[in-house]
Amino acid sequence: MKILLIGYGAMNQRVARLAEEKGHEIVGVIENTPKATTPYQQYQHIADVKGADVAIDFSNPNLLFPLLDEDFHLPLVVATTGEKEKLLNKLDELSQNMPVFFSANMSYGVHALTKILAAAVPLLDDFDIELTEAHHNKKVDAPSGTLEKLYDVIVSLKENVTPVYDRHELNEKRQPQDIGIHSIRGGTIVGEHEVLFAGTDETIQITHRAQSKDIFANGAIQAAERLVNKPNGFYTFDNL
């Protein structure tokens, strides 16, 4: 499989290493600013890249959105987070002409977490719910795209939910419909997501801890391996 990388930060550097270990080939990289240290051919436009079987994106909205407006037809794996609604609308449009895969978190374990959460929410309807995520001190967006995904699962199953991001400004007791959303940034934490169900005299915690960023890179590669043989359409872990 010949792979075009969109972005060449820490994540796509891992994708490159792991993909080559699996026998795949990196045919090019698209970056905001070309760098002399990038060990692959660098491009500015997707259409300029010849022979790629799939593109894997771990970048940012500033790089990705202009590329998505170009005229190209290439299976596309997208892991960029930020401006989610705009991104999903654009990917849905592109999926009419090419296979597109999107996940805010490329870990299959996190996908499993969403399924566990979907089963737990109806069973624990009277429990308060708090969501917490922790990441390294270089992550710029908060809350994480993964936490937003977990919140979306809850919203799909509960009515009149209210997200609460900053409780210290509230001088009132917690309301039953509140969903607390908390972000922690520090050190080199790869990624931790916890769902707390707090009831009367008991609590239940569901936690996913990433121990290496390789799980996200491998998840993207595995998605790409499946996507290249798919018909046009929008794919997630649910239908890939």
UniProtKB/Swiss-Prot annotation:
Highest taxon of the lineage: Bacteria
Pathway noted in the entry: Amino-acid biosynthesis; L-lysine biosynthesis via DAP pathway; (S)-tetrahydrodipicolinate from L-aspartate: step 4/4
A GO term, aspect molecular function: oxidoreductase activity, acting on CH or CH2 groups, NAD or NADP as acceptor
Catalytic activity field: (S)-2,3,4,5-tetrahydrodipicolinate + NAD(+) + H2O = (2S,4S)-4-hydroxy-2,3,4,5-tetrahydrodipicolinate + NADH + H(+); (S)-2,3,4,5-tetrahydrodipicolinate + NADP(+) + H2O = (2S,4S)-4-hydroxy-2,3,4,5-tetrahydrodipicolinate + NADPH + H(+)
Active site (UniProt): 135, 139
Binding site for NAD(+): 79-81, 103-106
UniProt-listed CDD domains: DHDPR_N
UniProt xrefs under Gene3D superfamilies: Dihydrodipicolinate Reductase, domain 2, NAD(P)-binding Rossmann-like Domain
A single GO BP: lysine biosynthetic process via diaminopimelate
EC number(s) reported in the record: 1.17.1.8
Protein residues bound to (S)-2,3,4,5-tetrahydrodipicolinate: 136, 145-146
Keyword Oxidoreductase tagged: yes
Family listed: Belongs to the DapB family.
Known role: Catalyzes the conversion of 4-hydroxy-tetrahydrodipicolinate (HTPA) to tetrahydrodipicolinate.
Listed name of the protein: 4-hydroxy-tetrahydrodipicolinate reductase
Species this chain originates from: Staphylococcus aureus (strain COL)
